[in-house]
Swiss-Prot record:
A lipid is attached at residue 105 (GPI-anchor amidated asparagine). Glycans are attached at residue 46. The keyword Secreted applies. It is a lipid-anchor; GPI-anchor. GO terms for biological process: negative regulation of activation of membrane attack complex. It comes from Saimiri sciureus (Common squirrel monkey). CDD domains: TFP_LU_ECD_CD59. GO terms for cellular component: plasma membrane; side of membrane. Coiled coil: none annotated. GO terms for molecular function: complement binding. This is CD59 glycoprotein. The keyword NAD does not apply. Residues 1-25 form the signal peptide. The gene is CD59. InterPro entries: CD59, LY6_UPA_recep-like, Snake_toxin-like_sf.
Length: 131
């Protein structure tokens, strides 16, 4: 890789590092008690550093909203913590992402950061091949 290709790669990595750095804590919807299915939780909180994702879990007619540790985002851990035997859940890592629509749609969305992380190596490889 020539000096120009290395400079371009360094520039891309620098932009990526600045873009992905987040100095603020994650913000999630959080209600101390489960809300009725027909209602939304509108209270938000800044999560502590050890709780790195937002959780929404539907169990029966109640919906739980809170900060959650992403590594603990499994049926077993969530059902044990919430004392629920049947639930549908979703964990996410974007501010205020724990909304009922993610449970209703059942899909996982890619964030802009994820897309940038996936595209950057291809762009760097393409630019390094230019003479």
């Amino acid at each position: 890789m020539g000096i120009q290709g290395g400079s371009v790669l360094f520039g891309l990595l620098l932009v990526l590092a600045v873009f992905c750095h987040s100095g603020n804590s994650l913000q999630c919807y959080s209600c101390p008690l489960p809300t009725m299915e027909s209602m939304e939780c509108t209270a938000s909180t800044n999560c502590t550093s050890n709780l790195d994702s937002c959780l929404i879990a539907k169990a029966g007619s109640g919906v739980y909203y809170r900060c959650w540790k992403f590594d603990d985002c499994s049926f077993k851990r969530i059902s044990n913590q919430l004392s629920e035997t049947q639930l549908k859940y979703h964990c996410c890592k974007k501010n205020l992402c724990n909304v009922k629509e993610v449970l209703e749609n059942g899909g996982t969305t890619l964030s802009k950061k994820t897309i940038l992380l996936l595209v950057t190596p291809f762009l760097a490889a393409a630019w390094s091949r230019h003479p």
